[in-house]
UniProtKB/Swiss-Prot annotation:
Motif 'HIGH' region in this chain: 30-38
Binding locations of Zn(2+) 1: D95, C99, H100, H106
Cofactor binding annotation: Binds 2 Zn(2+) ions per subunit.
Name this protein carries in UniProt: Lysine--tRNA ligase
PROSITE patterns according to UniProt: AA_TRNA_LIGASE_I (PS00178)
Xref: Gene3D superfamilies: 1.10.10.350, 1.10.10.770, HUPs (3.40.50.620), Lysine tRNA ligase, stem contact fold domain (6.10.20.10)
GO cellular component, one term: cytoplasm
Source species of the chain: Pyrococcus furiosus (strain ATCC 43587 / DSM 3638 / JCM 8422 / Vc1)
Presence of the UniProt keyword Magnesium in the record: no
GO molecular function, one term: metal ion binding
Motif ('KMSKS' region): 279-283
EC number(s) recorded for this UniProt protein: 6.1.1.6
Amino acid sequence: MVHWADYMAEKIIKERGEKEEYVVESGITPSGYVHVGNFRELFTAYIVGHALRDRGYNVRHIHMWDDYDRFRKVPKNVPQEWEEYLGMPVSEVPDPWGCHDSYAEHFMGLFEEEVAKLEMDVEFLRASELYKKGEYAEEIRKAFEAKGKIMAILNKYREVAKQPPLPENWWPAMVYCPEHRKESEIIDWDGEWGVKYRCPEGHEGWTDIRDGNVKLRWRVDWPMRWAHFGVDFEPAGKDHLAAGSSYDTGKEIIREVYGKEAPLTLMYEFVGIKGQKGKMSGSKGNVILLSDLYEVLEPGLVRFIYAKHRPNKEIRIDLGLGLLNLYDEFDRVERIYFGIEKGKGDEEELKRTYELSVPKKPKRLVAQAPFRFLAVLVQLPHLSIEDIIFTLVKQGHVPENLTQEDIDRIKLRIKLAKNWVEKYAPEEVKFKILSVPGVSEVDPTIREAMLEVAEWLESHEDFAVDELNNILFEVAKKRNIPSKVWFSTLYKLFIGKDRGPKLANFLAALDREFVVRRLRLEG
């Protein structure tokens, strides 16, 4: 089965024709924290660009920061005093936290740092800078000249939606008052570069389109941008792709006003966190950021989550027990890619998903420390990072001859596993080694089995986990001890719970002499 990004790349080549360079675009208004749902737009554009690059084409990925949009409302986490900045460009509203040059920069800066960790070739542009240096001046003037055409297009869709037509004094743009920087009403245009405006503070004045104070309204700005940059592909959320929405009107405006065709698009669904109710909102503050994911996920896994889901399927990221399954799945796909494991009829698609989840094709499989087991090891207080690596080698989870690249990856996973246990792991996964035996009285038959395991461990300084596992089963089987009762007793003995991690691996990771003493109920 063809990966969806490859399908889209082929469609772009077919419909847009062979080009020296294809342009893909994504865009976000930095009105609040840019969360993992917003990131889906950028990643969808990126991965289609990735597929085009893999076919030998040059690709320019523009991510447009719509930071010349107006500040519409004061978010819950911002002081109410910021009401005085309503109507100003978000790029000119002060940063409430005082650490960046503006409100918009606070959110843009963080997101750009987060994206850099994914090694994605993206060119971040700021709409405020492009408007202010007059880059869009010609296109803005064209929109003024085509005011009648634009109104006719918009009114056609408004009629279908049973909305009243636009008023005769409507203009395809608005002005930021040069003095107060508030959104102002346009009241006249001189037919060339001059635009007359009325400021909400009460005064009137003229401004030149080329001075950067005139900004196109969203339904005109979007198609203008497609034309200006020659955009071939831009994904969009379903609100922008519904019938009569900004994509529909944009297709007609770019053709009628700018003489070009709209880019191809893909609708992407929401991204949420499993167990979280409602839609994430950067201005409401109920969000998960990429930096939150980086606390528990390798960058490759973050990319993998988005690459494996078709854009029209909602993503629910499970930061609980499901995260262990995600690591297992990613490691399996990685082994399939390197031919170490066979797929189940889906081999080629899985390999391609993996390729699109990494910035460049890796030359070898870097050591995979099983995250599920690391979540156990990081809870053993006597183990240092070096001890954990030694345990992984000893139990055969990673090779003996580790390169620095291997060690770096293992250390990263250790850190991520520790974070996961502290922040997201359910109680059933957490445990503490008891300072005294969790059981004081044991059935004589079970006690006998415990002593036999203790004797075996005492006489085997070096052993394989499989050998210990076999002994654990054998001593119980020959005494007709039910497995559930036997294992439950051992878990209670060490961690005071009925259940726990894989027992043989767990016991093998503990100090051997301590395990022997505990099995003998000596401490």
